[in-house]
C-alpha cells in the first residue's frame, strides 16, 4: 500500500498537502482507495473563513466529502462489499440510536459524524475509511467522477422530494449555482413541465439552459422584488407551483414567497443569510407551504439509478479537474464562482 496524502485545512485560506497515516478500519468499516473528490460550497466556506455553520477550524482537518473510490480492505463484519468494489461515499455516520435515526430521518441525527466537519475527517485523501453501509456500489456504466458528483445530486433529489415535484409541475429556481442547476436537472427528470432559473450572473444562466432550464432570467441588482416576480410570471406564463430558493439570500426567499401560486410550495435548500425579513403573512394566507431540506435521506440509490439510466446527464455538470497537489488552486477557482463542479483526482 502506498503512502497516504491529504488536503489538510489549517485555517482560513491555509490548505496544505500532508502525509497522514493510512487509517485502521473497524469491523463495520471498509478502507477505500479514493479516486476523486468534488469541491462543494461548504468546502469553499471552510477554506475562505475557517468556519461553516457550527464548525470552527481550531485544529487541522482533512477536508472534502464528495468522494468515490475502490474498496481495498473490508472489516470482519462487512458482508455487503468486497475488495475491488467501486463505491460512492455517502458522507455521514449517524448515531443510529436517536429518535430521528430510528424514524429513518438519519439526515437529522442529533449526533452525526459528517465528513470534513469537526466530528470526522474528510475524504480528500488517498486512503479513507468509512462505515460500509454508507458506501454505495457504483453501477458498471458510471465513472468514478460521476460517483463523486452523485453526492450533491442526492442532496437535491431529497430536496425535490420535499418539494413534491410531480409530472407537469411548473418550477422557478432562484440561484443558478451547482445546487440550482442540479435542482433543474432533477426536476426535469421528475416530470416538471417548465423550469425557469434566475441568477445575477449571465454565465451561470447560460449553463442552466444547457442543463435543464426552459428559460432563464438575469436579475439586475436594481430590480425590486415585485419586478422580479412580474418578470418570472411573464416568462412562465403563470405563477409557479413550486419555488426553490437555491442560494439562501433574503431577496430570493422574499421573491419565492411572493411569486408562488396559491396553495403552492416554497422550498428553501440554500442557506446564506442568518436572519431575513420575509412577507410571511401574504404567503400563509394563501396556504403556501414553506419547507426546508437538509443533506441526504435515502436518496443515494435513486441518484445513482438516475445517472445510470441517463435520466440525469451528470457528466455534463462536471467542468474542471485538478490533481491533489493543486487543491489550493481548485479551491480558489471554486471561490471565484467561475466553475460549476470541480473534481480533484487524488492519486495524481
Swiss-Prot record:
Question: What Pfam families is this protein classified in?
Answer: ADH_N, ADH_zinc_N
Q: What does the record's cofactor remark say about binding? A: Binds 1 zinc ion per subunit.
Q: Which UniProt keywords apply?
A: Metal-binding, NAD, Oxidoreductase, Stress response, Zinc
Stated EC number for the protein is 1.1.1.-, 1.1.1.14, 1.1.1.9
Which residues bind substrate per the record? 295
The positions annotated for binding NAD(+) are 179, 199, 204, 269-271, 293-295
Looking up InterPro entries in the UniProt record yields: ADH-like_C, ADH-like_N, ADH_Zn_CS, GroES-like_sf, NAD(P)-bd_dom_sf, PKS_ER, SDH-like
Q: This chain belongs to which protein, by name? A: Sorbitol dehydrogenase
Which residues does Zn(2+) bind? 40, 65-66
Tell what triggers its expression. Answer: By cold.
Instruction: Give the encoding gene's name.
Output: SDH
Q: Which domain of life is it from?
A: Eukaryota
Q: What is the organism field in this record?
A: Bombyx mori
What protein family is recorded? Belongs to the zinc-containing alcohol dehydrogenase family.
Q: Which cofactor does it need?
A: Zn(2+)
**Keyword Zinc among record annotations:** yes
Q: Which GO terms describe its biological process?
A: sorbitol catabolic process
Q: Name one GO molecular function term.
A: L-iditol 2-dehydrogenase (NAD+) activity
According to UniProt, the reaction catalysed is:
xylitol + NAD(+) = D-xylulose + NADH + H(+); L-iditol + NAD(+) = keto-L-sorbose + NADH + H(+); keto-D-fructose + NADH + H(+) = D-sorbitol + NAD(+)
Q: How does it assemble?
A: Homotetramer.
Q: What does this protein do?
A: Polyol dehydrogenase that catalyzes the reversible NAD(+)-dependent oxidation of various sugar alcohols. Is active with xylitol, L-iditol and D-sorbitol (D-glucitol) as substrates, leading to the C2-oxidized products D-xylulose, L-sorbose and D-fructose, respectively. Is a key enzyme in the polyol pathway that interconverts glucose and fructose via sorbitol, which constitutes an important alternate route for glucose metabolism.
